[in-house]
Amino acid sequence: MKTFSAGRTDVGRKRENNEDSFHTDDQVGLYIVADGMGGHRAGEVASSTVVSSVKDYMEAFHTSPVAQETDESNMSPAATAVCHSIELANRVVYQLSQDQGSYKGMGSTAAVAYLHGDTLVTANVGDSRIYLVREDNIEQLTQDHTLFAEHIRKNPNWDPNSASIPMKHILVRAVGIHEAVEADVYEMQPLPGDLVILCSDGLTDMLSDDEIHQAVLAGGELEEVCSRLVDMANEKGGLDNVTAVVFFLQKEEKGLLHKLFGSK
């Protein structure tokens, strides 16, 4: 399968700096979104460090996919490599925060998608999400690592409208905050015509899953889809930096989504 992608990031309507970073590479099949945090531009450093660390590690693996040291989780070499790339990013960001006072306490989310052969590996830390759009459905492939999401998982019958949770956006997991981090890693078999979205919470805090889905189904070039998503988030208030990366998969022959998105 071939992939076609686009990405866009925007500072939003309320922030002075953009602390989001992203990366797309259709040749490698690698897509990354990171949302940094920390004062004095430290968030920008954290997110860009996550992106560069994951990118460098995965490019090396893609060029020469050597066997990866693994535990007993039965992950594929590709999934293990993605996991290791995030662990590397965590060590680099954490060490920077320890070595430079202005970076103390900085951290970042990470959302990574990697297409290796017929397997799509997705991984995340924090609340940057990955969605799968398949035909008429949209599915969140990742779980948010926030106080709010954790409360929902522990209390599945709780009505989120019944009471507010203080600091519900506080992350319970982030890259670079501690010496070690655990990423959620998933593997799936994608289908031709699948479309995948990676995004920061600046998008998902402003738009519902259904609004994101409708923005994708409206079609156009992939660049238009990214811009539509970002513009919609800004129109809703743009309270945070907004980043959207989209890519879709197809066989060599041109199918429905090729016509919808008018890829090259």
Task: Give the positions of each predicted feature.
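PP2C/PPM-type serine/threonine phosphatase catalytic domain
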Residues: M1-K264
